Design a protein with these regions (language model features):
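A cross-family kinase active-site recognition segment
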Residues: 1-49, 53, 59-66, 94-100, ...
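Alpha-helical scaffolds flanking conserved acidic
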Residues: 154-160
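Single conserved hydrophobic/aromatic residue that forms the stacking wall/gate
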Residues: 163-172
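Active-site Asp-x-Gly
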Residues: 67, 73, 80-145, 149-154
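Amphipathic alpha-helical segments that form well-ordered structural scaffolds
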Residues: 5, 54, 139-143
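Metal-dependent nucleic-acid phosphoesterase active-site entry motif
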Residues: 72-73, 164
């Protein structure tokens, strides 16, 4: 609910005028991460550039700009001990005005689901979300989409882009 509320903040507020450049946001992210890879590769991953080309050819039509956190997942929130609710979102240094689907994709990427087998890469981040009483990724994304009246048509693209950016940055060396 907090992420949907963030994405509903009007982007035409004067205070947000210098926060970001929403034009070609996704395209710039692809270019940025491929550039990082070209300049700072630690190991050879030639498939990454093929994937980058595919991403460039398949960028979804831009969504309406939104205020985005840039690193939204449970580890960047403060939760209530008494109730299942998020009290605050922290770690704002990547906040900008851009494509809100990037935030949703990152949240889903780090969200565990006890119903499925997960790769071990994010097991520590998924410790809370993998519990049996916690909503699934599908339910979580559906709740966000319903709150904002936005479709979830291209989530696989955005999740692919985020895994690509992680690989480009050699996050999992």
């Amino acid at each position: 609910d907090q992420l949907a509320a963030l994405h509903a903040v009007p982007t035409d507020l004067e205070a947000l005028a210098k926060l970001g450049r929403p034009e070609r946001f996704v395209e710039r992210q692809i270019e940025r991460w491929l550039g990082v890879r070209r300049e700072h590769a630690v190991r050879d991953l030639p498939e990454l550039f093929s994937l980058g080309e595919w991403l460039q050819r398949n960028v979804p039509v831009a969504s309406a700009p939104a205020v985005i956190h840039g690193d939204y997942h449970l580890d960047n929130t403060l939760a209530s001990k008494e109730h299942p609710e998020i009290l605050a979102i922290i770690d704002w240094e990547l906040a900008t005005v851009g494509d809100c689907y990037m935030d949703v994709a990152l949240m889903l990427m780090f969200w565990g689901d006890y119903r499925t087998q997960e790769p071990p890469a994010f097991s520590a981040l998924q410790a809370v979300s993998r519990r049996a009483a916690v909503v699934s990724r599908r339910e979580l994304a559906g709740r966000w989409a319903e709150s904002l009246g936005r479709p979830l048509n291209h989530m696989n693209f955005y999740i692919c882009l985020l895994y690509t950016s992680d690989a480009a940055d050699d996050m999992f060396r």
